[in-house]
Amino acid sequence: MATQASVEWIFNVAGSAASASLAKSIKDAGGSEDFAKYVVARFYDNYKDSIDDSGIYNACMGRARTVDKALNDSRLAERNEEWHTNLATIRRLDLELAELKLMLSNLGMKREERVLNSMFSVTREEGRSSNVVMLKQNAVKMIEEGKLKIKVEKNENYTESLKNKIEELECIIGAFEKGKEINIALDAMTGEVRLDGDSCSYNSTAAFVSTIMGTPIKMYDESNKPLFDVGKYINPKHVIDKMIESEIPIFKSDYRNNESPDFDAWNENSNLKIVSVNDCHAICVFKFENEWWCFDDGRLRKYNGIGNPLIVANSKFQIDRILISGDIELNPGPNALVKLNDCITKYNLKIICTFDVNLDDDGSIMYICYLKVGSAEATGNGCSKKEAKRRAAVSILDQLGM
């Protein structure tokens, strides 16, 4: 089929190239654009009739079918019941193929364009302006045989999330070339978190997408409005769809939701999920070292297994580390840290700050901050380093009379 498709493409390109050349010649000679369009339209109709009536089209397609059959099984390469391919036939086909390549080259269709067209196709998803590049069977076969190497061009101006997706693509290609099972190691992390009792869908989706992207995702603008606002229909499935609409680099091949036909199979093997708890709360759960953990509105704790999966990640994603952000502010209040830093600078005070980590009774991680400023000492507990340090800073400011 590949040769037949190539021949069909050659005829289409030849007609288009000739039409464009004819239109340009008419305009260069002073003809109007309307006249050029009229002549080109008549030419293209005559061109199709000509290659059909002359038998050139059918002859070329017949030879293409012969080549395709010869590629699949030389014994099946029949032109008719009594005719089989032989060395002379192949020589003639090679010569004609070389002539066609020369013709394309003269029309401006260079080798790079011919090769790319034989291996890739471009489709567009309905309702979206972006394009999807698909591998043709010819390219897949060449990858399996080790004849095709895919390199991804890198740029220092790429965002961190895009660099991570490129590295992921390179890992997939490498595993595919070596015939190995594809595994992508991820760091579990949260995105930007907000605690107001209504943001669990945003929080859980932020953790899910941030983990896949490899970088914490920003969820709110300067006015504290959601960047991926879904209005009243707050559901992780709607939030992640909004992210894709906003061209966040997460793809349909990365996950499935509970409306997908193959959801059950994905759910069974997935290591990263968004789970609905009692149909009123959403958390991001993940498997780490054979135990299930979760980010519950930014708090890391052991997962108790309660809930129904809404979104599950591709099983190729595996968690090998947990990153706990020290910048998640769960209960901001007055900015004691800024005030304390001003005092330290103003009075030239020495500061000692260390952190310890413990597991709380419910399995969540609790930070302990030991803070000493001058002669004042205090400790603070919190679900993040920043929260623990802020609470210790409040105590220090009280001791210093500020």
Curated annotation (Swiss-Prot):
Family assignment from sequence similarity: Belongs to the rotavirus NSP3 family.
GO biological process: regulation of translation
Lineage of origin: Viruses, Riboviria, Orthornavirae, Duplornaviricota, Resentoviricetes
Main subcellular localisation: host cell
KW Cell division (keyword) present: no
Every DRBM domain range: 334-402
Gene3D superfamilies for this protein: 3.30.160.20, 3.30.70.1610, Rotavirus non-structural protein NSP3, N-terminal domain
Protein name in the entry: Non-structural protein 3
